[in-house]
């Protein structure tokens, strides 16, 4: 209805012509390899991460609170629909996550990581790849969880963008799955 300003009040976009009310789907993680994000804060990064995960056959995303709302329109838009293929679950703490998945091999991605990612081989069984916040990374206490690893890069930068580091890590950990893949 042209005279109704409700859509304009609810939408953050100028060219919105319809609004839908939906119930949020409650998701839980399944067994398998996981990506764990500790306190992620960037909406665009979150959507890009979801899309990248799907591209490398990672279907489980754990988010340690506080973290972005995966149902935010900016996240949904950036995910290009990937979100609807993932299992996503929020946890109040990393310890709560570990209680649910105690048998996973833990790999923490950190600037102070002990092992170069190129020297890490994924073991049999499931693993969890743990990444920190975009601006601060993982706190030093995460050095005590599992195996801490780093992605080597030139001295010209301090760190890599979270979604880029995640993409490189997923490529490394899924290299055996895709090594014989032909052009799409």
Predicted regions span which residues?
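Short, hydrophobic beta-strand segments that form beta-sheet elements in well-ordered domains
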Residues: 1, 19-22, 90, 105-110, ...
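Arg/Lys-rich RNA-binding interfaces used to dock onto structured RNA substrates
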Residues: 1-43, 174-175, 181-184
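Short beta->alpha connector loops at strand-helix junctions that form conserved
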Residues: 2-4, 38, 64-65, 87, ...
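Short, charged, surface-exposed secondary-structure boundary motifs
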Residues: 9-14, 97-98, 117-118, 158-164
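Structured adenosyl-cofactor binding patch, chiefly the S-adenosyl-L-methionine
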Residues: 18-20, 50-56, 68-84, 140-184
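Conserved beta-strand segments that form the floor/walls of ligand-binding pockets within enzyme
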Residues: 19-21, 35-36, 62, 129, ...
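RNA substrate-binding interface of SAM-dependent RNA methyltransferases
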Residues: 26-112
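Active-site/ligand-binding-proximal alpha/beta "capping" segment
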Residues: 108-158
């Amino acid at each position: 209805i042209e005279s109704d300003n409700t859509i304009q009040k609810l939408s953050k976009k100028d060219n919105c012509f319809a609004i839908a009310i939906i119930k949020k789907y409650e998701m839980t993680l399944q067994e398998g390899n996981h990506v764990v994000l500790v306190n992620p804060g960037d909406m665009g990064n979150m959507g890009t991460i979801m899309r990248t995960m799907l591209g490398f056959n990672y279907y489980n995303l754990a988010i340690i609170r506080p973290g972005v709302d995966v149902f935010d329109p900016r996240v949904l838009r950036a995910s290009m629909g990937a979100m609807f293929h993932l299992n996503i679950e929020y946890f109040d703490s990393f310890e709560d996550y570990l209680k649910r998945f105690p048998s996973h091999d833990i790999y923490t991605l950190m600037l102070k990581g002990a092992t170069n990612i190129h020297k890490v081989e994924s073991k049999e069984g499931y693993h969890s790849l743990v990444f920190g916040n975009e601006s601060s990374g993982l706190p030093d206490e995460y050095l005590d969880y599992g195996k801490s690893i780093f992605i080597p890069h030139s001295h010209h930068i301090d760190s890599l963008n979270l979604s880029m580091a995640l993409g490189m890590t997923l490529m490394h950990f899924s290299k055996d799955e895709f090594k014989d893949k032909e052009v799409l």
